[in-house]
């Protein structure tokens, strides 16, 4: 039986051909290699039609044009040559579209990304809708690749080299108005008239290319180009620390096309695409993509979720305000905030106002939309308006008695079906639910700060939590735009438990004489977004270290922090960025002065700050403890799978994505190598480095955590 076509042709009475893109059985249009023959058959018909006046590509999907190429095609390639052939086929198809003798217009609504934008770039003109769903970008770099179907050559010529480089190197997505301003699209229209606007453009002569701004024309010349690529190269190297080979190849390929012409540029693009597809970095980044897609589809339990119509939040502090924002503005649910202090409610409301007003200023949101979203949030100092809330998120102080009191009050003032979700970072959920009348409706829902930016949430059922409560909480997290992992109710849960030994070791090296900036730079070089000591300053030294005694009580000496260091720092009123002084000193708010290490820290903790370890040695000590603890978490079923463990570390603490997460990284090194490193470190620095039993056993048997296919677990 022949596969239904993803591309269908309809020639209108006015001799404008409409090519409708609709991949059968899929929510998103993605380009697959087998579609090439369908498009070529259509191109043949178009060339034979002598009456043809123009062509329009449009999607039948409600919220996407083309979301990119099917990534599985790359995974099926066994060699760089095979991946290069794939790129050349894409380039050839786009060239055939571009070579049509009549105007070809892309009518874009929704996501137009990767191969989708490359198809649109191959057209002679582009019209898109003014809808918030409409975004245009080339995100291949986020998978360790570059655009392989002509994007590196067409985009710089259309919008200018410096703007194109910013898009390709970062994977940045543009909204409709931004795309129009830069010349990426020719018109922005309401969705209701998208097709007709594209048809009108197709009836005109081919749109002439917009003259580039003077600055872009200078930068495209030999002298300007040399300066631009040198400057962008240095900036990119600083940002990536040399860990992402795709960025270097993007610069090389774009420059080749500008200096030697498009033919050389296309050759370089296809060759680089093939080579990058085989790099371990790209394989790891693609694995993370597949894993996160799977997690987003995971319902959390077998039970159907309960309806979610409205949410309550207890506490209007930083976390409460952030949770209210994602609940109202991402999930679109009415939110009622309760705080004992009216100022707390005002703080939470201002938090959402600031976020939304920023979007209005950047023209990402209309003022009317801002007001509509803000109207979903209300506040109270008692339980007025809480009677019919489906789920209450508690975000009060980390105090067990207080949280137990919140459970009792919610059970007294809310409906019998209401779920109580605690945003605790350290207290056992079973203890919070200890006196609950309906313990099956109590669960942990651990957000990370800042709530609107951090993609991960941990969902923590205790022994009596019902399957429906789990499913409903997972459903809410997804509505809020989060990636949820379900973890076991053990001290520290997963993320904080693997983070604590990593930070402890950094502080221990500080007491041994390593410099603050050296430790942080070593872990940034390894691939973390910030170093461990800066992270502690950002989180708040008082907040970040609160969990250490909890973990030490639960798991023993391996979690003990260096004696008296934390207390000495806190006694000196150092809380980190929030009060302007921690390990670093921070300039006054609003000023652009950089943070700088406070040399007074060293005598305060009895350290010299001389240093003798290399950057790789510093990183090794911190990271090995994190890996060991992640394996223990898997062994104790704190996490349900290595997939959740990798996603939790990458999305929760910024574990280097190009390494694929702790379990992928262990597999890449080999369990035997990890055990050997840890045994060496245990001999040098103490028993906290003793490899856990599972790692030792896997080392003996030559086992790995992941199977060879991208999405299968062992």
Curated annotation (Swiss-Prot):
Pathway: Lipid metabolism; fatty acid beta-oxidation. Its EC number is 4.2.1.17, 5.1.2.3, 1.1.1.35. Its main location: cytoplasm. It catalyses: a (3S)-3-hydroxyacyl-CoA = a (2E)-enoyl-CoA + H2O; a 4-saturated-(3S)-3-hydroxyacyl-CoA = a (3E)-enoyl-CoA + H2O; a (3S)-3-hydroxyacyl-CoA + NAD(+) = a 3-oxoacyl-CoA + NADH + H(+); (3S)-3-hydroxybutanoyl-CoA = (3R)-3-hydroxybutanoyl-CoA. The record marks 118, 140 as: Important for catalytic activity. Keywords: Cytoplasm, Fatty acid metabolism, Isomerase, Lipid degradation, Lipid metabolism, Lyase, Multifunctional enzyme, NAD, Oxidoreductase. GO terms for molecular function: 3-hydroxybutyryl-CoA epimerase activity; enoyl-CoA hydratase activity; long-chain-3-hydroxyacyl-CoA dehydrogenase activity; NAD+ binding. Gene3D superfamilies: 1.10.1040.50, 2-enoyl-CoA Hydratase, Chain A, domain 1 (3.90.226.10), NAD(P)-binding Rossmann-like Domain (3.40.50.720). The keyword NAD applies. PROSITE patterns: 3HCDH. It is found in: Cytoplasm. Heterotetramer of two alpha chains (FadJ) and two beta chains (FadI). NCBIfam families: FadJ, PRK11154.1. Catalyzes the formation of a hydroxyacyl-CoA by addition of water on enoyl-CoA. Also exhibits 3-hydroxyacyl-CoA epimerase and 3-hydroxyacyl-CoA dehydrogenase activities. In the N-terminal section; belongs to the enoyl-CoA hydratase/isomerase family. PANTHER family: TRIFUNCTIONAL ENZYME SUBUNIT ALPHA, TRIFUNCTIONAL ENZYME SUBUNIT ALPHA, MITOCHONDRIAL. This is Fatty acid oxidation complex subunit alpha. The gene is fadJ.
């Amino acid at each position: 039986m022949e596969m239904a076509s993803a591309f269908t042709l309809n020639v209108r009475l006015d001799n404008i051909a409409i090519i409708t893109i609709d991949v059968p059985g899929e929510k998103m249009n993605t380009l697959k290699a087998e579609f090439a023959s369908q498009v070529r058959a259509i191109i043949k018909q178009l060339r034979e039609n002598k009456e043809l006046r123009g062509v329009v590509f449009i999607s039948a999907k409600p919220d996407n044009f083309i979301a990119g190429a099917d990534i599985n095609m790359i995974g099926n390639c066994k060699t760089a040559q095979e991946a290069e052939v794939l790129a050349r086929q894409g380039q050839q198809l786009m060239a055939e579209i571009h070579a049509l003798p009549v105007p070809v217009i892309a009518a874009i609504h929704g996501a137009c990304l990767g191969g989708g934008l490359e198809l649109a770039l191959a057209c002679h003109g582009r019209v898109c809708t003014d809808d918030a769903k409409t975004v245009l970008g080339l995100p291949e770099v986020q998978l360790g690749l570059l655009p392989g179907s002509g994007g590196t050559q067409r985009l710089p010529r259309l919008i200018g080299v410096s703007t194109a480089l910013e898009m390709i190197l970062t994977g940045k997505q543009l909204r409709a108005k931004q795309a129009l301003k830069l010349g990426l699209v020719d018109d922005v229209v309401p969705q209701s008239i998208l097709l007709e606007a594209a048809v009108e453009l197709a009836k005109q002569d081919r749109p002439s290319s917009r003259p580039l701004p003077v600055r872009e024309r200078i930068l495209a010349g030999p002298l300007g180009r040399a300066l631009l690529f040198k400057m962008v190269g240095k900036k990119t190297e600083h940002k990536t620390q040399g860990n992402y080979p795709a960025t270097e190849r993007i610069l090389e390929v774009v420059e080749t096309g500008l200096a030697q012409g498009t033919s050389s540029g296309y050759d370089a693009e296809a060759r680089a695409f093939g080579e990058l597809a085989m790099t371990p970095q790209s394989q790891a980044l693609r694995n993370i993509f597949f894993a996160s897609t799977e997690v987003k589809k995971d319902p959390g339990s077998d039970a159907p979720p309960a309806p979610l119509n409205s949410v309550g939040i207890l506490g209007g502090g930083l976390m409460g305000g952030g949770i209210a924002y994602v609940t109202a503005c991402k999930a679109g649910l009415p939110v009622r905030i309760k705080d004992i202090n009216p100022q707390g409610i005002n703080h939470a409301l201002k938090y959402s106002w600031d976020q939304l007003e920023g979007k209005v200023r950047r023209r990402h949101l209309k003022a009317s939309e801002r007001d509509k979203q803000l109207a979903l949030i209300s506040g109270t100092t008692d339980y007025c308006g809480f009677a019919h809330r489906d789920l209450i998120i508690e975000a009060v102080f980390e105090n067990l008695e207080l949280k137990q009191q919140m459970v009792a009050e919610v059970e007294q003032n809310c409906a019998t079906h209401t779920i109580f979700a605690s945003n605790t970072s350290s207290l056992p959920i079973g203890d919070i639910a200890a006196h609950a009348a309906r313990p099956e409706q109590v669960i942990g829902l651990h957000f990370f700060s800042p709530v609107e930016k951090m993609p991960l949430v941990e969902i923590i059922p205790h022994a009596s939590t019902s399957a429906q409560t789990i499913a409903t909480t997972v459903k809410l997290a997804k509505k809020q735009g989060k990636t949820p992992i379900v973890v076991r109710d053990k001290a520290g849960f997963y993320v904080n438990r693997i983070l604590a030994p990593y930070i402890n070791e950094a502080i221990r090296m500080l007491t041994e004489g390593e410099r603050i900036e050296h430790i942080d730079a070593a872990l940034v070089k390894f691939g973390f977004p910030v170093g461990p000591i800066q992270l502690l300053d950002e989180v708040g030294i008082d907040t970040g270290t609160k969990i250490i005694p909890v973990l030490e009580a639960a798991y023993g000496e391996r979690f003990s922090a260096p004696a008296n260091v934390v207390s000495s720092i806190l006694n000196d009123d150092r809380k980190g960025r929030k009060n302007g002084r921690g390990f670093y000193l921070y300039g006054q708010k609003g000023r652009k002065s950089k943070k700088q290490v406070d040399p007074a820290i060293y005598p305060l903790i009895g350290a010299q700050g001389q240093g003798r370890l290399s950057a790789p040695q510093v990183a090794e000590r911190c990271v090995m403890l994190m890996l060991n603890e992640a394996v223990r978490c898997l062994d104790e079923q704190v996490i349900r799978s290595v997939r959740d463990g990798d996603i939790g570390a990458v999305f929760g603490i910024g574990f280097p994505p190009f390494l694929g997460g702790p379990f992928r990284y262990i597999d890449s090194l080999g369990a035997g190598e990890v055990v050997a490193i840890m045994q060496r470190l245990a001999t040098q620095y103490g028993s906290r480095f003793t490899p856990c039993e599972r790692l030792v056993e896997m080392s003996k048997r030559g086992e790995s955590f992941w199977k060879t296919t991208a999405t299968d677990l062992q």
